[in-house]
């Protein structure tokens, strides 16, 4: 039996992080968690990490798509999407969270480049804060590790 598993130590990886500016007080922690995981655990060099800011979570799929097209030309091995969508009193949450998730998934499938989903979709600010580095860990760091592992899984499959 042949088992394929990826490792996270990927010193030569080139990784882009697309991050939403909206809810930046939470997203800044996700970004720090992602960068820390890439450098400390993944051993990714600082010069191989690119951060791209977009207005909000709804804009993430388009930016990630552009980054994956760059990846096909030797730009990036993976892209991490970071953001926070917090439920409010209107249907806006469902539209933004759903389109962001669907769009990122489509980009990953179409590009065949790892797109790690680090977008928090929470019921409250408190839940978002918990997932950005307090009680529930840092989902930015988790997304970074997912991206690194998927780089290696896909290399092993090909």
Swiss-Prot record:
Pathway: Cofactor biosynthesis; riboflavin biosynthesis; riboflavin from 2-hydroxy-3-oxobutyl phosphate and 5-amino-6-(D-ribitylamino)uracil: step 1/2. It comes from the Bacteria. It catalyses: (2S)-2-hydroxy-3-oxobutyl phosphate + 5-amino-6-(D-ribitylamino)uracil = 6,7-dimethyl-8-(1-D-ribityl)lumazine + phosphate + 2 H2O + H(+). The active site is at 92 (proton donor). Forms an icosahedral capsid composed of 60 subunits, arranged as a dodecamer of pentamers. Belongs to the DMRL synthase family. This is 6,7-dimethyl-8-ribityllumazine synthase.
